[in-house]
């Protein structure tokens, strides 16, 4: 397994972020395709410069994130969101990552859920775009069980869909992050290393520094390895007052385990 970090966890602009990732001794970085890195703003010259900056820092792009204000299950103004994701997928292929991460919306087991046809058709179209271009759209885990997500994938005739497995998201939504790995073993193309504490009577579930939450990382990483996952394990820290220090501590923590 290869270790990386999300640029957004560092709270730094792109160039300074690359230098910090190199200082931390990590091999990869995930970046959101927003601002100057947005597909509609990144020129061919910009793409060449981005690839050069990555190479000069000895880094690989692990994936592009594609933040959406609304999921792909929301019918209002849906087509522009589909087009946006499609553009980011194509950009991810051009930049060598080939993986785009998206929070698509909740996958419901209810046959009469009115949002599901929109989600299904959107993801089928995007997955088939991935089939044609060699890119993969990775759905972020957390809102449904691994078995529910697998069952949903099995209804779609495309190999262009995968999973970004985020154990903390699952834990905070009441799912066991280890038990839910196996159903998705053939779909996991990218993973986040993020920790969390379970909800208690006196508090809500919350993110925690890596190694400071309720996830059994030795068991989790051991299970990932047993399932023959050899891809990226990318540290993500979304809260905290000193996230760079938390990331550095997380790097040291993971290196003791992988």
PLM features per residue range, with description:
Residues 219-220, 225, 232-233:
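H/E-rich (His + Asp/Glu) clusters that bind or coordinate divalent metals
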Residues 28, 99, 190, 231-232:
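Residues at the N-termini of beta-strands
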Residues 42-49, 78-86, 112-123, 175-180, ...:
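Charged helix-capping and loop-helix junction motifs
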Residues 13-19, 53-56, 60, 70-163, ...:
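Active-site acidic/histidine proton-transfer and metal-coordination neighborhood
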């Amino acid at each position: 397994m290869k270790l990386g970090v999300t640029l957004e966890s560092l709270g730094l602009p792109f160039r300074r972020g690359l230098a910090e990732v190199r200082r931390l001794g990590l091999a990869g970085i995930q970046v959101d395709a927003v601002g100057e890195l947005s597909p509609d703003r990144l020129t061919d010259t910009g793409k060449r410069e981005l690839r050069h900056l990555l190479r000069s820092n000895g880094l690989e792009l692990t994936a592009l994130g594609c933040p959406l204000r609304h999921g792909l299950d929301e019918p209002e103004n849906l087509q522009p969101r589909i087009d946006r994701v499609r553009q980011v997928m194509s950009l991810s292929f051009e930049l060598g990552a080939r993986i785009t991460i998206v929070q698509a919306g909740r996958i419901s087991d209810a046959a009469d859920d009115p949002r599901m046809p929109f989600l299904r058709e959107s993801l089928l179209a995007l997955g088939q775009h991935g089939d044609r271009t060699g890119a993969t759209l990775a759905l972020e885990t957390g809102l449904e069980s691994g078995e529910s997500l697998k069952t949903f994938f099995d209804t779609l005739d495309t190999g262009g869909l995968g999973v970004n497995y985020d154990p903390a998201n699952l834990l905070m939504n009441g799912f066991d992050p280890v038990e839910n790995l196996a159903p998705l073993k053939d779909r996991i193309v990218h993973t986040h290393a993020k920790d969390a504490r379970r909800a208690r009577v006196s508090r809500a579930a919350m993110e925690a520094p890596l190694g400071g939450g309720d996830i059994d990382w030795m068991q989790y990483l051991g299970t990932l390895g047993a399932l023959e996952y050899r891809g990226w394990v990318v540290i993500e820290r979304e809260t905290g007052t000193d996230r760079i220090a938390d990331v550095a501590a997380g790097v040291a923590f993971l290196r003791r385990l992988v």
